[in-house]
UniProtKB/Swiss-Prot annotation:
Its EC number is 6.1.1.5. It comes from the Archaea. This is Isoleucine--tRNA ligase. One of its GO terms (cellular component) is cytosol. NCBIfam families: ileS. Keywords: Aminoacyl-tRNA synthetase, ATP-binding, Cytoplasm, Ligase, Metal-binding, Nucleotide-binding, Protein biosynthesis, Zinc.
Length: 1070
């Protein structure tokens, strides 16, 4: 790929990608680009690691495309960018996929298969998917350090997590304790609250009576989890709430005394099917506090500590609202709020449910049953004990495991925690030092999450993860200060009773499980848990730098300059990094955050592979190419909003790249014919030899295009710096399509067609070379394939080997001409209006017109035409332009009036018809209602005619053969009138240009070289038209490269209908 080599006629994305991939490999393009900035100012980008649990979907494709684009942009801005890709290779996302492959349904299957064998399967699965993911990312042009990714399974990375956790422990923020946690009974492990995914399900909805001990009646509670009632310890009320004692009567005359929140009485009685009731007494919630009751299933679950002090009484609960019954069944062994309030009250924690969701022996009658399966038995037992007031069902949102989709349960277990709540103020202060795009994501969504974040449960009862590096002594008391937390492999080797090689030790289970440590005669063994997988990625900002094993890069680069992920990471990676950075290092590990949205289907539905609702990236690449797909993804705002994929917009991107391709191809053959010595500036690795814009005698339109380019460069750079690359793309594409393709190329086409080299052609060549080079650079982060190919043709052997080594284009103030830009904006608006007027008149642009009249509404129109009227005349193919100054009237215009009889009738009564007829005949030279009234009065012989603007609508009447159209810009307005009256001179040139167009088509059909000369015979079957054509023989021969018009012996012959006249044209190559 060099110089003026062959350029395919059409933009073919697949062909371009194939050639560019080969080229990149041949010249080590990525490696050269990295080395080129090796000594520059650093920019530390940290890649949020995707799970290696499947192929790249549209969401990860959008994410990686954004990252790649911003990395390329920063490199072009002169930075040495850290671009190490990362992969999250531990945790449930991997384990559940492996379980599916092996047909496992529970932990028991894993135990039977063998823990070590299962871990090896997980490792193999993660490695295989890493290769697939990496291949996916490379397929759409992502450049990262693919040979050196950070992997959460590597010993150096796992050590980074161990070290951070040991720092957290040294800071006094590690605790072993009981908490109510979300538990997946299938995976048999705790999961973080932010990992819980909610689905609508149908569950029991029961109202239960808890009989009071020392007074008549029952407390009425409501729950959707009957399976938690065996663990009930207290009932919570709102101490400030209003409650009522109600005597309710059933249809058969029996009565029940119930205690319910005042606002809930009617609903509770309706649910219970009561026919009548009376309010016995009003109570405040504080009145009820201290009342004791008998749990309805006490005999079925004898292990429930009914005799413990304070159990089975009424207490205040901050979370209680006047909803359902206004009294809340509370089981500290299950619910999070229940557990916290129970701890405050020093109540026992009774949890008769195991990690698998099955009742333990403490569950009494229900022992061995899965909790949700036990609901029916519990409901039946409540009914048998006359404790059931009403049993219904409800559809509601319920939490499920994020990986296996099993409904979660809340149970209390012993876990390891980082006590984030102890450093909440530091978390919020550190958060405020980071800059977010959009800002509201930090100040609203993220702040809310951080403010309400509980202590971080970092332990998981699984296999494939980073083992928790805690060794506990024999007969451990549970005090976190008495444990050993190992921070590095070297430390492990020094402390271990066994021989451990720090360079080769595998830190995974079960290797580390067998390692013991003895200190002062006491043996320590490792706890069996692995880390929450979010802790893995929380250390990415130093793990990617191989810290603490290597310190230099950390000291130079940390914290990260930029991270970017989707908005779900406010509860995920953004949060875990802030939490770990603050707890371990006292600082936030990133300075700037770009938060984008989700990738959705075209109709706005969320994509889901499991539901078959998805658009795969390879589908899009096969249909339209990688560059168009990237450009669409980068045309969407990256700041918080979700993206709905659009096939149409992706097709439009391919169309725009095809326009760029054609613009690029346009001057190449002319440049080659003239041996144009193209200039390559130093910013592109060139030596500034050849003909540049500084050496050329630029014409007005060249200066205009270069000025517009400066405007676009300034806007694009500002948008990139504001993380609005979509707006930068809009600006560049508008320039390519509107300014470059639809205007400049059309204006300079005839300059390119001139036979001999000239200063005018040279200026156009130099302008196109510079503009195309900089446009290619501006588009390089978006479309790395096509820009690479175009760049190589533009630079040949003079520039860098890859466009991605080039500097980002900077604004050249000397080329700015804002006044010229404003003038040309007026001319283009007038040209568009003139084209519309031509269409109205049915006159093609290739036919000249005798004159164009511009009725200017502002002086800026007059100024633009005075300075550059010849440019508009050329574009509208007119022999002359006449200008009507602002405030003046074109004396060839007239205005008639269209009457509104609904206004004339009431005003003129019986004379309205006569007035209307007079209005139809009246003509004035301006939209002057008084002048119109004078004409009507004179026509009717009256002097009492008064008209208003509501009575008539002025209608402009142009002279015969004249059509007009208005235009308006931000600073100018006017009307363009085109006089399409024919005379022989106009006809002669019009027919001649019709001949030229058809000969050019024939040349193309014959595949003639652009500079090939021909013989041309023109036979016209109309004597008059033939004479008109003959008058412009020099124009025809010049435009078609015909030596002469004359008889052709053996040429390509075609018959044409030209404006109703038959012509036979015959072309023969010389």
């Amino acid at each position: 790929m060099s110089g003026f080599g062959d350029v395919p006629d059409q933009y073919d994305p697949a062909g371009v990608e194939e050639r560019v991939f080969s080229y990149w490999e041949a010249v080590d393009a990525y490696e050269q680009t990295v080395d080129h900035r090796a000594d520059a100012e650093t920019f530390f980008f940290v890649d949020g690691p995707p799970y290696t649990s499947g192929a790249a979907h549209m969401g990860t494709t959008w994410n990686k495309t954004l990252k790649d684009a911003y990395i390329r942009y920063h490199r072009m801005q002169g930075y040495d960018v850290t671009d190490r890709p990362g992969y999250d290779m531990h945790g449930l996302p991997i384990e559940t996929k492996v379980e599916e492959q092996l047909g496992f349904e529970s932990k028991k299957d894993i135990q039977e298969f063998g823990e070590e064998a299962f871990i090896e399967e997980c490792k193999r699965f993660a490695d295989d998917n890493l290769d697939g993911l990496q291949s996916d990312f490379q397929s759409f042009g992502v450049w990262m350090d693919w040979d050196n990714p950070y992997k959460t399974v590597d010993p150096s990375y796992m050590e980074a997590a161990w070290w951070a956790f040991s720092e957290v422990h040294d800071n006094g923020l590690v605790e072993r304790g009981q908490r109510s946690i979300s538990q997946c009974p299938r995976c048999e492990t705790a999961i973080a609250n932010n990992e819980v995914e909610y689905e609508d399900v149908t569950d029991p909805s029961i109202y239960v009576r808890f009989d009071l001990d020392d007074r008549e009646g029952s407390l009425v509670v409501w729950t959707t989890t009957p399976w938690t009632i065996p663990a009930n310890q207290f009932v919570a009320v709102d101490e400030d709430g209003d409650y009522q004692q109600v005597r309710a009567t059933t249809p058969d005359g029996e009565t029940d005394v119930l205690y319910v929140a005042s606002e809930c009485v009617e609903d509770v009685l309706s649910a219970g099917g009561y026919s009548d009731h009376e309010i016995v007494a009003d109570h405040s919630g504080s009145d009820l506090i201290g009342w004791s009751y008998t749990p309805p299933l006490a005999d079925a679950v004898p292990a429930n500590p009914t005799d413990a002090d304070g159990t089975h009484e009424v207490y205040h609960g901050d979370w209680v609202e006047a909803d359902r019954t206004g009294l809340v069944h509370s089981a500290p062994g299950h619910g999070e709020e229940d557990f916290e309030r129970g701890a405050e009250l020093d109540l026992p924690v009774f949890c008769p449910v195991g990690e698998d969701g099955v009742y333990t022996d403490a569950g009494g009658k229900y022992a061995g049953a899965f909790v949700r399966d036990a609901n029916d038995d519990i409901i039946a037992d409540l009914e048998a004990r006359d404790a059931m007031l009403a049993s219904q069902t409800v559809e509601h949102s319920y939490g499920h495991c994020w990986r296996c989709d099993t409904g979660i349960i809340q149970i209390v277990t012993d876990q390891w925690f980082i006590t984030i709540t102890d450093v909440k103020d530091e978390l919020l202060a550190n958060m405020d030092t980071s800059e977010w795009h959009p800002e509201w994501a930090r100040d609203n969504r993220f702040r809310d999450f951080v403010e309400n974040a509980p202590d971080w449960n970092v332990s998981r009862q699984r296999y494939w993860g980073i083992p928790v590096p805690i060794w506990t002594p024999e007969d451990w008391s549970g005090d976190a200060e008495d444990v050993l937390v190992v921070g590095t492999r070297e430390e492990l080797a020094a402390l271990a009773d066994q021989d451990v090689d720090p360079a080769s030790v595998d830190l995974h289970k079960p290797t580390v499980d067998d390692i013991t440590i003895t200190e002062d005669g006491t043996e320590y063994t490792r706890v069996p848990d692995v880390f929450d997988v979010w802790l893995d990625s929380s250390v990415a900002s130093w793990g990617t730098l191989n810290y603490p094993e290597q310190e230099d890069d950390f000291d130079e680069l940390w914290p990260a300059d930029l991270i970017m992920e989707a908005h779900d990471q406010t509860r995920g990676w953004f949060w875990s990094q802030l939490g770990m950075g603050t707890a371990a290092l006292g600082d936030v590990p990133y300075e700037e955050v770009l938060m984008h949205g989700y990738a959705n289907m075209p109709d706005g539905r969320g994509m889901s592979k499991s539901k078959g609702i998805t658009i795969e990236p390879n589908e899009v690449i096969d249909e339209y190419g990688a560059d168009p797909m990237r450009m669409f993804l980068l045309s969407v705002t990256p700041q918080g909003d979700d993206m709905s994929f659009s096939w149409d917009e992706t097709e439009n991107m391919q169309r725009d790249l095809n326009i760029l391709w054609n613009v690029f191809r346009f001057p190449r053959p002319y440049m080659a014919l003239d041996d144009f010595d193209a200039n390559v500036p130093a910013a592109f690795g060139g030596d500034d030899a050849g003909v540049g814009i500084a050496d050329a005698d630029l014409e007005t339109v060249d200066e205009w295009l270069l000025s517009r380019l400066q405007h676009v460069k300034a806007d694009a750079t500002a948008h990139w710096e504001d993380f609005e690359q979509h707006r930068a793309l809009d600006a560049v594409l508008e320039f390519v399509v509107e300014d470059l393709s639809r205007y400049y190329v059309q204006v300079v086409r005839e300059r390119m067609w001139e036979d001999d080299a000239s200063a005018s052609k040279t200026a156009a060549y130099a302008t196109m070379q510079r503009v195309l080079l900089e446009v290619v650079a501006l588009l390089a982060p978006y479309a790395p394939f096509v820009t690479e190919e175009l760049y190589s043709h533009l630079t040949g052997d003079r520039g860098y080997d890859t466009v991605h080594m080039a500097d980002w284009p900077t604004v050249e103030e000397s080329l700015r001409a804002p006044a010229l830009e404003a003038d040309v904006a007026v001319l283009r608006a007038a040209e568009e209006a003139g084209s519309h007027a031509r269409q109205q008149a049915g006159r093609k642009l290739r036919w000249p017109v005798t004159r164009v009249v511009v009725d200017a509404a502002e002086d800026s129109v007059v100024d633009a035409l005075d300075a550059h009227g010849d440019l508009l005349a050329d574009r509208l193919n007119t022999r002359a332009i006449e200008v009507v100054e602002p405030g003046a009237a074109w004396d060839e215009l007239a205005y008639s009036a269209r009457a509104d009889m609904s206004e004339l009738g009431p005003a003129f009564g019986d004379d309205a018809g006569a007035v209307m007829n007079a209005l139809n005949d009246a003509r004035v030279t301006d939209r002057d209602i008084d002048a119109l009234a004078e004409q009507v009065a004179a026509d009717l012989g009256r002097d009492d005619i008064e008209l208003t603007t509501e009575m008539v609508e002025f209608v402009e009447e142009t002279p015969e053969h004249v059509a007009g159209a208005a235009f308006e810009t931000e600073t100018a307005a006017g009307t363009v009138y085109v006089d399409t009256e024919l005379n022989e001179d106009v006809e002669s040139e019009g027919y001649a240009r019709e001949v030229v167009r058809r000969v050019q088509e024939m040349r193309k059909e014959m595949d003639l070289a652009m500079d090939a000369e021909i013989r041309l015979d023109v036979l016209v079957f109309d004597e008059r038209v033939g004479e008109l054509v003959a008058r412009h023989e020099p124009l025809i021969t010049a435009e078609t490269r015909a030596r002469e018009l004359g008889e052709v012996e053996d040429g390509h012959r075609e018959e044409w209908d030209v404006e109703g006249t038959t012509m036979i044209l015959e072309v023969e190559a010389v």
